[in-house]
From Swiss-Prot:
Belongs to the RNA polymerase beta chain family. One of its GO terms (biological process) is DNA-templated transcription. This is DNA-directed RNA polymerase subunit beta. Pfam families: RNA_pol_Rpb2_1, RNA_pol_Rpb2_2, RNA_pol_Rpb2_3, RNA_pol_Rpb2_45, RNA_pol_Rpb2_6, RNA_pol_Rpb2_7. Its EC number is 2.7.7.6. The RNAP catalytic core consists of 2 alpha, 1 beta, 1 beta' and 1 omega subunit. When a sigma factor is associated with the core the holoenzyme is formed, which can initiate transcription. One of its GO terms (molecular function) is ribonucleoside binding. One of its GO terms (cellular component) is DNA-directed RNA polymerase complex. DNA-dependent RNA polymerase catalyzes the transcription of DNA into RNA using the four ribonucleoside triphosphates as substrates.
Length: 1364
């Protein structure tokens, strides 16, 4: 708190015990950093890294033609000028984008086919316009076609290798089937599985499986190579009579002795026959120098040859590798004189025989056969040759153009398989595939564990930059095909690069991504918190992700690795639960896309100030202490053992073994959840509702920050982008409701930096959710501000803090059944004082087009409309600002030409005499839709270039230009004043060598010392002629004036550019002549049926608005504002609201005490009280002057603001102490009296101040009535829903109810004339007009539809009518 004066920033009494180690990082930096890395806009072309856009161009270029005679190479890209500002794009319905230009080089070769040499014949380099690319605004959003959108980051499975098993569910035998999968970012997937028969199979791209060894042989490995790679071997010696096994400590241990083994020099038995070779026995044998062990022939049954056996005499192959040994085999080998051979060592833990079985199945011997066989299986229709097949396999896995593991994939592969291949190698290598198979075989043999795919080490975040990079690549690949075709079709020498490149496919893909992708979403702009959380959202849905239907329970569940990375609370209720999540407060995404969280480094039991960001993989096996572990002043753990997390499990660890410590208790939860005070006392389900409902709170007209907050309110307000934040230190030189002007001091006296910043505030603009976006200055004239200070409040912020609702006095009490089922009883005072009044702005748009029948016209001259209806329109036919409008009122008058009708001779004559009549146009004016009643706050007119502007357009233009002129004049004036003050410091007391004149008047005489008065009145332009005796000073003067002149010209130029932009007309869609947008503001007061909620998931609907005098009141006569149902607390288990209400009572009562002291002007008592309340900041309070003390205390008249951080908040005894010091009952309850009877309620009642929000589900938007309206074309029944102006459906259950009551005539009326009996409807109308009350029902249209449908099925159906 000490960094800002108390008078400028509200102080909150904080109950947090844990010291703040590190500030919360900027809440929307993930979006910004990702997009900056993608564009590298501020990096010179030659210094750009191969990431993002640069990487995409490098991966597609160079593009070579089919014959190899020409190549199109990429050199660099650069960005053009931004044409329109963000605000202009929003108003004009345009996209905020920047043009991109690429420099490419076309190289033409002379190819000597015989020698295979290429010589460069020609090089042409050219810069080409390459379409536009949307830019991100400072707030991390995109403006697409005039609406703000957010690209949500996607959480998807990382590339790399994954091992898994099916838990025995796939096969009837219940055998566990193990699988491995190598997933690239781009290219073919490899799946390996060991099937129930224990054979290792491979699938490529989920096609038909084939034995894995087929692929290994295609890579050039022989059967022997594979057996020796996957298995250990044993060497045997064959003599005519006996068999010996070479002594090998590794393989021998654990085997049984088939013959008793004795010491070589004595009869001492080492291992008896039939016993196991133990470690001790093997060691004894090694010491005794035993080199071979005799075995029996039976021991070789079912054993397999590891290498082929050759005939020693002829060199022929007697038996191939992988041959099973039997008696005949041994006899044949003895006969041939074979003395040494090798067998495979098989024992538990040596890999099983799945590879050996696959080798028996693959039926190929050579590499060539294997290649052809795989090609035949994957491409059955194509003719197969060895060369084609080899090229195909190469292309599948080993070519960067077709296969990309990405740096992440390579890193994950290295980590999982224990490799150290450089990260730059982004294709697979043969060893990777082989090692994956070996790991899978070992896994089947119970060595190692399978991967957990829901672990955050195996899921990564694809932020905006990467999502757009993938789209851009798709566009470039489409363009590449077209370029190759053009290169081969036309004569290449005559072509320039721009003849080959057409950027349309790329632009189309980017446009499609931003416009229609599931991840590009309409920004939730209900309030600042909803904006921030929308930008921090992670979605598992979207292209390449999961679908709601397929996602199981595991993916949606909270995982231990989410701790500090993903919020376990904030997720939507409904089908998307767990698939859409939010980043935790301190979390960030690293360059590989993994979510990291910060920890304090702990060394030898001391928590240091060093901070380390770790991903879920990096914190594996590290004991992590919680943030609330008790520490002494030096940072050492107080207790000898510390409760820590290891791999998500809680364990007790010695303090010396702890490696890391959490940074803060709220690093666990998201921004929205950490705005809930006493979150630790709420049930998880209700906390979820609480964090979701805060995002639906409507910004109120009069904002008020919560008395009981969590200390995060300021951070959210600052980072959301709705408040104005000072970019540099400065002083406020001008401030009004629409702009703030800051003047900056220079660091050096004689230098000229930009002197002034003008902040234009947003006034009553419409947000995406139709809420009102309005900024108010919170600085005073002359105030000094620091960079990063909030200088203007936005919607739902107060004094730089988030303020979503209002503090109201709430009692928990049943009241006449009006708070049944969570209903809320509200005081009339809240409506009268506009406590929960909000402003909503609707936008209405009308366009006049050039139609086939002629031009539409926006005009006041509308046929068949009386003067009364036109009273609010100006001469141009557009409603005036400030007009109060109701449903049906005309906002913009518009007429459209009708089709030519055949005129009678009389009409022709009349038309010839009286000229054009209004008969050939129809009224298509924009009218106010039902349910909208308010005031016109803004109108915008956009006219096509070359169309004559009407008066209203000129008026709007003049206002805009006047505002620009004011900004320019202010900037120039401050610049001039600054220059003048700097000049005075340089030339004071100096003498001029020649007089400075303006016309004939002498401004500065020659030879006299220059005074401040001379310069005060002197214009700056003539001073350029000033020459001083001191040359050094003279030079500084001219340097200063030169900089001033340049800056002045730059300001003037920018002003002229903006004016020019306003005057030259607008870019409108084809066929549109003029577009008018009207904004109508509506005041929504709190009314019965509005949904309200607290911050703990305690939601309800307003059931009754009671007069103040009927509500329960305190002993001093103060009535409460709201009555809630006490039964809503116990079963919901959100006790946080009770603690909030108690602390709120204390805060309010302390505020009352401060107010009393202020009124009595008891300054000593006031200072003492303030020091008592803000005990942690007592020294600062003591240092305040009397005036400052009064100013600071004035902020707390309506209650003392407190902060109770999540998981580190106020304890029960602290609340009771505070209640006592505030002079109220420590129980937090009070005696209340019934306002209707004046009698006291039985028992004391829980009452206090609670923060309540009004949610976006307003009754005015939902209520709807219809008498007559549109009917469905086919069934002729009324449409449904408010948007269609529909009726209430009378369904079959309602028909049953009417039947049950026997109301036959009423029912007949419902089903015929009131619904779809067309003839009956007209007859009914006639009867009503004539005053007769006779019902004549006809045939309902829906019955006719049924008859026609049955007839269309070929069933002849007709209705037999009885004669009356």
């Amino acid at each position: 708190m000490a960094d800002r004066p108390l008078t400028q920033q509200r102080l909150r009494k904080s109950f947090g015990k844990i010291a703040k180690i590190v500030d919360i990082p900027n809440l929307i930096e993930m979006q910004r950093i990702s997009y900056q890395r993608f564009l590298q806009m501020d990096v010179p072309p030659e210094k750009r890294e191969t990431i993002g856009l640069q990487a995409v161009f490098h991966s597609v270029f160079p593009i070579r033609d089919f014959s190899g005679t020409a190549s199109l190479e990429f050199v660099s890209y650069r960005f053009g000028e931004i044409k329109y500002s963000v605000e202009d794009c929003v108003h004009r319905g345009m996209t905020y984008e920047v043009p991109i230009r690429i420099t490419v080089r076309l190289v033409v070769f002379d190819v000597d086919k015989e020698k295979g040499i290429q010589n460069i014949r020609d090089i042409k380099e050219q810069e080409i316009y390459f379409g536009t690319i949307p830019l991100m605004t400072e707030q991390g959003t995109f403006v697409i076609n005039g609406t703000e959108r957010v690209v949500v980051s996607q959480l998807h499975r990382s590339s790399g290798v994954f091992f898994d098993h099916d838990k025995g569910k796939s096969h009837a035998s219940g055998k566990v089937i193990y699988t491995a999968r190598i997933i690239p970012v781009r290219g073919s997937w490899i799946d390996m599985e060991i099937d129930p028969k224990d054979v290792l199979y491979i699938r490529i791209d989920r096609r038909r499986k084939f034995p894995a060894t087929l692929l290994f042989k295609a890579f050039g490995y022989s059967t022997e190579d594979l057996l020796n790679y996957f298995y250990q071997t044993e060497k045997l010696t064959l003599t005519p009579k006996t068999l010996f096994k070479e002594f090998d400590a590794k393989t021998l241990r654990g085997q049984r002795a088939s013959i008793t083994v004795k010491m070589p020099d004595s009869d001492e038995v080492i291992v008896k026959k039939g016993r196991l070779f133990t470690q001790r026995a093997v060691k004894t044998m090694a010491q005794a120098g035993i080199e071979k062990v005799a075995i029996l022939q039976e021991d070789l049954e079912d054993k397999v040859l590891a290498r082929r056996v050759l005939d020693p005499k002829t060199g022929e192959v007697l038996y191939p590798a992988n041959h099973e040994i039997d008696e005949a085999t041994l006899e044949a080998m003895r006969d041939a004189g074979v003395q040494k051979f090798e067998i495979l060592y098989s024992a538990p833990g040596t890999g099983g025989d799945s590879v050996r079985k696959a080798l028996l199945l693959d039926k190929v011997e050579s590499r060539e056969e294997a290649l052809v066989e795989i090609y035949r299986r994957l491409r059955p229709s194509n003719p197969s040759t060895v060369e084609v097949a080899k090229d195909f396999i190469d292309q599948l896995f080993f070519r960067p153009s077709h296969y990309d593991l990405s740096a992440v994939g390579r890193m994950k592969l290295n980590m999982r398989l224990g490799l150290d291949t450089p990260v730059e190698v982004k294709t697979l290598r043969r060893e990777d595939i082989l090692l994956t198979a070996k790991t899978l075989v070992d896994l089947k043999d119970s060595q190692g564990a399978v991967d957990d795919i829901d672990h955050l080490g195996n899921r990564r975040v694809r932020a905006v930059g990467e999502l757009l990079e993938n789209q851009y690549r798709i566009g470039l690949v489409r363009m590449e095909r077209a370029i190759k075709e053009r290169m081969s079709l036309q004569e290449i020498d005559a072509l320039m690069p721009n003849d080959l490149i057409n950027p349309k496919p790329v632009s189309a893909v980017v446009k499609e991504f931003f416009g229609t992708s599931q991840l590009s979403q309409f920004m939730d702009q209900t309030n600042p918190l909803s904006e921030v959380t929308h930008k921090r959202r992670l979605s598992a849905l979207g292209p390449g992700g999961l679908t709601r239907e397929r996602a199981g329970f595991e993916v949606r569940d909270v995982h231990p690795s989410h701790y500090g990375r993903i919020c376990p609370i904030e997720t939507p209720e409904g089908p998307n639960i767990g698939l859409i999540v939010s980043l935790s407060t301190y979390a960030r995404v690293n360059e590989f896309g993994f979510v990291e969280t910060p920890y304090r480094v702990v060394t030898e039991g001391q928590a240091t100030k060093e901070i380390k960001y770790l991903s879920a993989m990096e914190e594996k096996d590290l004991p992590i202490a919680q943030a609330n572990a008790p520490l002494d002043e030096e940072g050492f753990f107080i207790n000898p053992t510390v409760s820590s997390r290891v791999e998500g499990e809680l364990t007790i660890v010695k303090k010396e073994d702890v490696k890391l410590m959490d940074i803060s208790p709220n690093q666990l939860v998201s921004v929205s959840s950490s705005m809930i005070p006493f979150l630790e006392n709420d049930d998880a389900n209700r906390a979820l509702m609480g964090s979701n409902m805060q995002r639906q709170a409507v910004p109120l007209l009069a904002t008020e920050a919560p008395l009981i907050g969590t200390g995060l309110e300021r951070v959210v307000a600052r980072d959301s982008g709705v408040t104005l934040v000072a970019k540099r230190d400065g002083k406020v030189v001008a401030v009004d409701a629409s702009r703030i002007v800051l003047q900056h001091e220079d660091e050096r006296k004689d230098r000229m930096d930009k002197q002034v910043t003008i902040y234009n505030l947003s006034k009553f603009t419409r947000s995406n959710q139709n809420t009102c976006f309005n900024q108010r200055p919170i600085v005073k004239l002359g105030q000094e501000v620091k960079a990063g200070d909030i200088i203007a409040d936005g919607p739902a912020t107060e004094n730089g803090e988030l303020a979503l609702g209002r503090n109201v006095t709430v009692a928990f009490l049943p009241w006449g059944g009006y708070n049944f089922e969570d209903s809320i009883l509200v005081s009339e005072r809240l409506v009268r004082d506009g406590v929960f009044t909000s402003v909503h702005i609707e936008e209405f748009e009308v366009v006049s087009r050039d139609t086939k029948l002629g031009k539409e016209e926006i005009t006041r001259d509308i046929p068949n409309v009386g003067e009364e209806a036109l009273k609010n329109l100006d001469d141009s036919g557009i409603v005036r600002l400030g007009a109060e409008v109701r449903p049906g009122d005309i906002l913009v008058g518009k007429i459209t030409p009708k089709g030519e009708t055949q005129l009678s001779p009389e009409e022709k004559l009349l038309r010839a005499i009286f000229g054009e009549k209004a008969g050939d146009v129809k009224d298509t004016s924009l009218r106010v839709p039902p349910g909208v009643e308010g005031v016109v706050v803004d109108a915008k007119v956009f006219a096509r270039r070359g169309v004559e502007k009407d008066d209203r357009t000129r008026l709007i233009e003049d206002e805009e230009i006047a505002a620009l002129e004011k900004d320019r004049d202010d900037e120039l004036k401050i610049m001039e004043d600054t220059v003048r003050s700097k000049l005075i410091t340089i030339v004071l007391g100096q003498e001029a060598t020649a007089p400075v004149k303006k016309g004939k008047a002498v401004l500065i005489p020659k030879g006299q010392p220059i005074t401040a008065e001379m310069l005060e009145d002197c214009p700056l332009a003539p001073l350029e002629a000033l020459v001083l005796k001191d040359e050094d000073h003279s030079e500084r003067v001219h340097e200063l004036l030169e900089i001033y002149r340049e800056q002045r010209e730059s300001v003037q130029m920018s002003f002229e550019e903006q004016v020019n932009r306003y005057q030259k007309g607008d870019d409108l869609p084809p066929g549109v002549i003029k577009m008018v947008k009207i904004y109508v503001a509506m005041k929504r007061r709190l009314s019965v049926g509005d949904k309200m909620a607290g911050r703990h998931g305690n939601k309800g609907v307003v059931s009754c608005i009671l007069p103040q005098e009927d509500l329960p009141y305190f002993e001093n006569g103060t009535p409460v504002d709201m009555v809630l149902n006490p039964l809503g607390v116990p079963s919901r288990m959100n006790v946080g609201q009770i603690l909030e209400i108690h602390l709120g009572r204390a805060a309010k009562s302390l505020g009352d005490q401060i107010e009393a002291l202020l009124e009595e002007q008891k300054l000593d008592g006031l200072r003492q009280k303030m020091q008592e309340i803000f005990s942690s900041d007592a020294d600062e309070v003591a240092g305040l002057t009397e005036q400052e003390l009064l100013e600071v205390a004035g902020q707390y008249k309506r209650g003392v603001h407190m902060a109770t951080p999540v998981f580190d908040g106020a304890k029960e005894d602290e609340i009771t102490d505070l209640l006592s010091s505030a002079g109220v009952s420590p129980s937090g309850q009070a005696v209340l009296y019934d306002g209707r009877t004046g009698e006291r309620f039985k028992g004391e009642i829980t009452v206090g101040t609670m923060y309540m929000l009004k949610l976006h589900h307003l009754v005015d938007d939902k209520i709807h009535a219809r008498s007559i309206g549109p009917y469905s074309l086919v069934t002729q029944q009324p449409l449904g829903g408010k948007a269609q102006f529909g009726g209430q459906r009378l369904g079959e259950m309602e028909v049953w109810a009417m039947e049950a009551y026997g109301a036959a005539y009423a029912l007949q009326e419902f089903l015929t004339v009131k619904s779809d009996d067309m003839v009956g409807r007209t007859r009914m109308y006639e009867k009503i007009v004539k005053g007769q009350n006779v019902l004549e029902p006809g045939m309902p249209e829906s019955f006719n539809v049924l008859v026609k449908e049955l007839q269309s099925l070929g069933l002849e159906m007709s209705l037999i009518e009885e004669a009356k």
